[in-house]
Amino acid sequence: MNTNDIRTVKGEKSLQGTIKVPGDKSISHRSLIIGSIAEGETNIEGFLYSEDPLSTADCLRKLGVHIPEIKKDQPFTIRGLGIDGFREPKEILNCGNSGTTMRLLMGLLAGQTDRNFILTGDKSLNERPMGRVSKPLSLMGGKIYGRENGTKAPISITGNKLKGCVIGTPVASAQVKSAILLAGLNASGTTSVIEPASSRDHTERMLKAFGADIKIRGELGRNIVIKSGNNLTGQNILIPGDISSAAFWMIAASIVPESEILVKNVGLNPTRTGILHVMDEMGCDYKIIEKSTIAGEPIGSIKVKYVSNLKPFKVQGDILPKLIDEIPILTVAACFCNGVSEIKDAKELRVKETDRLKVMARQLKKFGANITEKEDGLIITGESKFHSAEVDSETDHRVSMSLAIASLLAKGSTRIARAGASNVSYPTFWDDLEKLIN
């Protein structure tokens, strides 16, 4: 990760124009992973060419999957090995900074019998919690070992026969749910996942499209049941733009005076659109146009205009999983609302790439923001007058981009250290910012 570069952003600039954000990160990971266990070819278009999905591709190649060199903005085809076709790798599988890669592979590899695998990551990933995946997989018969009683990477997996069972997840996490469902493909009988709240459902949608026997039951899709025995068949996948990347421009257009931005072809999966509900609460001026559905995923273009006198908002409870990655940029937005905004029930942010609650509070205070950090969230008093500052992404991609948007509201020029962290999810972010600055 190239995080050492410093970027300078001049404040008091408006943003105008049309932008197409990179492909959805969640769907990019899953297209590779599910394509790799399908039979036949899977054609992928719109793939996010960034560090995290490329880590997934690299790991799958070491497991024997045919994945060509992936080039930016070019479609490609992978040849799957079937549900139980991975070979034992000769090397350690390095997941880089990608929690999705590590957690989903843990589920996928747990049932690959009589083969051994070791997963590791960078310094940040090796401190992130893996027990939430290793514990349910162990209940299914998985043999998973690691630091701190299997809760921290490096992780060692000895493939074993798994048995289907009913598992309640302690947090509403798409990564945990996906790991269990992928393990369920190789388990005897039926595997059922019960969530405390609805989380991203890209895995369920894609598994169904590939031919898995999967059913969603219960209120808000909280009970997902998968039955082993069905072979998966390769598909054609067109990946929409990532709403978590689009959120930076949607919020920027809302809070930067005289701004208007059209973001094209954004994924509008209802488990990801919490940001739109908060924008409604704030009184933002946006509309969704050019709506369609591709491979079971709704998409549309979002047009957003600046509004003065935005209202404060409260984020808590079941909406958190629908906007967990948007909390950093929403923290910036709250600084420019008229009143006190509150983010609660967001403890999960403390175990992301960084402790995002602490880092966002620390960095935005350098601009002059009025933020109080709580154990599970933030209280932000709006109507801030930002001044230029020396800030630092602290190696977190979403922090880097949030600070860039905050800098547009500051008087003078702001320097952002380790700005290149944005490459993890949005490699063209700084180029796109230059295009939009008016």
Swiss-Prot record:
Per the record's keyword annotation, is ATP-binding included, yes or no?
Answer: no
Residue positions binding phosphoenolpyruvate = K25, G99, R128, Q175, R356, R398
As one GO molecular function, the record gives: 3-phosphoshikimate 1-carboxyvinyltransferase activity
Chief site of localization = cytoplasm
EC number from the UniProt entry: 2.5.1.19
The UniProt entry, under InterPro entries, shows: Enolpyruvate_Tfrase_dom, Enolpyruvate_Tfrase_sf, EPSP_synthase, EPSP_synthase_CS, RNA3'P_cycl/enolpyr_Trfase_a/b
Question: Could you tell me the keywords of this UniProt record?
Answer: Amino-acid biosynthesis, Aromatic amino acid biosynthesis, Cytoplasm, Transferase
This protein's pathway: Metabolic intermediate biosynthesis; chorismate biosynthesis; chorismate from D-erythrose 4-phosphate and phosphoenolpyruvate: step 6/7
Subcellular location(s): the record lists: Cytoplasm
Q: Name one GO biological process term.
A: chorismate biosynthetic process
Q: Where does 3-phosphoshikimate bind?
A: K25, S26, R30, S173, Q175, D325, K352
Q: Which Pfam families match?
A: EPSP_synthase (PF00275)
Could you tell me what reaction this enzyme catalyses? 3-phosphoshikimate + phosphoenolpyruvate = 5-O-(1-carboxyvinyl)-3-phosphoshikimate + phosphate
How is this protein annotated for GO cellular component?
Answer: cytoplasm
Q: Where is the active site?
A: D325 (proton acceptor)
Which CDD domains does the entry link to?
EPSP_synthase
**What's this protein's family per the entry?**
Belongs to the EPSP synthase family.
What is its biological role?
Catalyzes the transfer of the enolpyruvyl moiety of phosphoenolpyruvate (PEP) to the 5-hydroxyl of shikimate-3-phosphate (S3P) to produce enolpyruvyl shikimate-3-phosphate and inorganic phosphate.
Query: Self-association or partners: how does it assemble?
Result: Monomer.
The name this protein carries in UniProt is 3-phosphoshikimate 1-carboxyvinyltransferase
Biological classification of the source = Bacteria, Bacillati, Cyanobacteriota, Cyanophyceae, Synechococcales
Q: Which gene encodes it?
A: aroA
